[in-house]
Amino acid sequence: MFKNLRLLGFFHFFFIGEFMSHYFRNDPNLISEETTYQVEMFDQKFTFLSDKGVFSKDHLDTGSYALIANLDIPTHAKILLDVGSGIGVIGIILKKVHPNLDVTQIDINTRALELNIKNNKLNQVETTVYESNLFSHVDKTFDCIVSNPPIRTGKATIYNLYKDAYKHLNTYGQL
């Protein structure tokens, strides 16, 4: 019985793990297959371009939906950072709902960032979008930091996100 489990683990790693592209890594060899999907929130319709190799490529995932729907942006908040923004769903919806909010979106995935920029135009918003591995290229502080963290990267990454977020929050800032 245990021999079969080891074999199954080997099969999963060798045949799936080796060839599967993860949204939290850049994979320039992954063939593009752009698609679109719609999101309705706050009595508005949003359209998002998506592709292989990005998180939740064909729909808004439940966690992001719950985060956006329940997020209470503080009234004093002027600048917001979306860490691990992917194709921009969270940041774009928040910018549309809070047009005076200065939104910055960061991610490690180049393909997701390219789609994020296109999605800004598609949804007629303007956010700042750039590449950063968590806070490695972030030199500002923010009133609010949001993230639907990439749990598949492991606990260490998530702990670093929380630890480093504190350094990038303004006084009375919220994560």
Q: In which residue ranges do the predicted regions lie?
A:
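Positively charged N-terminal leader segments that act as targeting/secretion signals
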Residues: 1-10
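Residue-level detection of beta-strand-connecting loop/turn positions
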Residues: 43-45, 52, 124
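Conserved SAM-binding loop and adjacent beta-strand
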Residues: 51-68
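Conserved beta-strand signature within the Rossmann-like core of class I S-adenosyl-L-methionine
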Residues: 173-175
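Glycine/threonine-rich flexible loop motifs
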Residues: 155-157
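N-terminal auxiliary segments of SAM/dcSAM-dependent transferases
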Residues: 11, 15-42, 53
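A short glycine-rich, Lys/Arg-flanked "PGG" loop and its adjoining helix->strand segment in the class I
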Residues: 160-171
